Amino acid sequence: MDRKMLKSKIHRATVTGADLHYEGSITIDKDLMEAADIIPYEAVCIWDVDNGSRFETYAIEGERGSGVICINGAAARMVAPKDLVIIASFVNMNNEEALKHEPKLVFVDDQNRMLPARKEVAGQGTLKKVAW
């Protein structure tokens, strides 16, 4: 049996731009792509923390060290600059591989600079509660 597993994610990155008239994709700082093991044209899921939008696109390399996270094409209507997003990639693997798998987790600050590596913490964490 194969399982679809989280391969990597860039957690709570700040959107730096939204370019409606570009052909599509998400432009990601090359340093962040390498840290998250995402290659050009790889499919990624984007989850907007601020408005709940969820969509899939593909990654293209942005300038190394720039902190760029730019949503391109039609998906630009689903985000706004300064929104926080989670960028996730997935991989299929057999059950034996899946049981040993550790995803690459990339945490960033509000300028999309990498923070020290750490394990993901389950539960409520320290985030503010959302008032509905």
UniProtKB/Swiss-Prot annotation:
Binds 1 pyruvoyl group covalently per subunit. Is synthesized initially as an inactive proenzyme, which is activated by self-cleavage at a specific serine bond to produce a beta-subunit with a hydroxyl group at its C-terminus and an alpha-subunit with a pyruvoyl group at its N-terminus. It is found in: Cytoplasm. Pathway: Cofactor biosynthesis; (R)-pantothenate biosynthesis; beta-alanine from L-aspartate: step 1/1. Its EC number is 4.1.1.11. Transmembrane segments: none annotated. GO terms for cellular component: cytosol. Keywords: Autocatalytic cleavage, Cytoplasm, Decarboxylase, Lyase, Pantothenate biosynthesis, Pyruvate, Schiff base, Zymogen. The keyword Lyase applies. Substrate binds at residues 57, 73-75. The active site is at residues 25, 58. Catalyzes the pyruvoyl-dependent decarboxylation of aspartate to produce beta-alanine. NCBIfam families: panD (TIGR00223). This is Aspartate 1-decarboxylase. It comes from Geotalea uraniireducens (strain Rf4).
